[in-house]
């Protein structure tokens, strides 16, 4: 049909049109349209449209549209949308979208988008996006994104992004900033690993490498990380030099207010104008330390390295 194909009730077979296909009931078979495929009830089969694919209730099979796929209830199969895939309730299979995948309730399978994946309730599977992944309740599987992953409930599996957040979890959080609200059974690997009990502590100290240093220590029950910077890696008589450092370590109590800790750190050193006097423009260093700390109060302590 050159312009449009219209079936008021159910359709079993093949619809091919230059503009739009419309089925008032359920469609079983193959639909191909230059602009849109619209099914009032269910779809089972293959649907290919240039712009929009809409199914009022359940969709099962392979659905492709250049712009958007919308399903009122459940979706299973392979769904590919140039911009958006939206399913009102439960979804399973593989969803691929240039912009975003949105599932109103649960999702089982793999969902991949250029920007955002959203699951309103639970996820079992994998979310991969360029910007962020959001699961409203529990997740069993993996989230990978270019900016952030969020799980509103508990997750079992792994979160990989610059920022990872969850209510509770069991597994891995790998990123620059990792956070959980209640409890976590697993391993956090990041520049800052935080929870409601994490103490953010200001540190001021001197040393024989960088002479004057300031840092922020993010301390949990045993493990801690330190982010900071220092000045005058060279002597005070030389021109200005500075460094940035990151350290991760473990602290244990020795006696009452006395604690011992050990950490390993990376240091980036910039010599600035000293490079004109025979010094390298920049240096990199790995440094291990053993520290003794005495807590004078809950907010003040003395550290010797």
PLM feature spans:
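Hydrophobic, lipid-facing positions within transmembrane beta-strands of outer-membrane proteins
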Residues: 14, 30, 46, 50, ...
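Leucine-rich solenoid repeat scaffolds
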Residues: 169-205
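Transmembrane beta-strands of outer-membrane beta-barrel pores
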Residues: 4, 20-22, 36, 52-54, ...
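Thr-biased low-complexity repeat/linker tracts and other Thr-enriched repetitive architectures
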Residues: 28, 33, 44, 52-55, ...
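Repeated loop/turn-to-beta-strand initiation elements of outer-membrane beta-barrel proteins
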Residues: 12, 26, 42-44, 58-59, ...
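Residues on the lipid-exposed face of transmembrane beta-strands in outer-membrane beta-barrel proteins
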Residues: 162, 176, 191, 212-218, ...
């Amino acid at each position: 049909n050159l312009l449009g194909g219209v079936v008021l009730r159910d359709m079993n077979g093949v619809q091919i049109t230059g503009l739009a296909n419309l089925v008032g009931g359920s469609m079983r078979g193959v639909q191909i349209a230059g602009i849109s495929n619209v099914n009032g009830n269910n779809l089972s089969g293959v649907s290919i449209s240039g712009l929009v694919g809409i199914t009022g209730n359940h969709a099962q099979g392979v659905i492709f549209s250049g712009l958007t796929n919308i399903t009122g209830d459940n979706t299973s199969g392979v769904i590919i949308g140039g911009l958006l895939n939206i399913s009102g309730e439960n979804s399973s299979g593989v969803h691929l979208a240039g912009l975003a995948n949105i599932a109103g309730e649960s999702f089982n399978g793999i969902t991949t988008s250029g920007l955002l994946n959203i699951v309103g309730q639970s996820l079992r599977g994998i979310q991969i996006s360029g910007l962020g992944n959001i699961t409203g309740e529990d997740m069993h599987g993996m989230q990978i994104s270019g900016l952030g992953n969020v799980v509103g409930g508990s997750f079992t599996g792994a979160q990989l992004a610059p920022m990872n957040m969850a209510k509770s979890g069991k597994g891995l959080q790998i990123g620059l900033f990792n956070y959980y609200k209640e409890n976590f059974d697993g391993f956090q690997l990041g520049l800052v690993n935080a929870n409601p009990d994490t103490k953010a502590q200001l540190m001021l100290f001197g040393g024989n490498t960088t002479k004057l240093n300031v840092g922020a220590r993010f301390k949990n029950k045993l493990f801690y990380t330190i982010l900071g910077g220092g000045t005058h890696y060279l002597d005070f008589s030389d021109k200005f030099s500075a460094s940035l450092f990151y350290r991760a370590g473990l602290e244990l109590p020795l006696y009452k207010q006395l604690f011992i800790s050990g950490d390993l750190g990376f240091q980036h050193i910039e010599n600035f104008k000293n490079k004109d006097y025979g010094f390298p423009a920049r240096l990199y260093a790995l440094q291990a330390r053993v520290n003794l700390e005495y807590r004078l109060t809950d907010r003040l302590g003395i550290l010797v390295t």
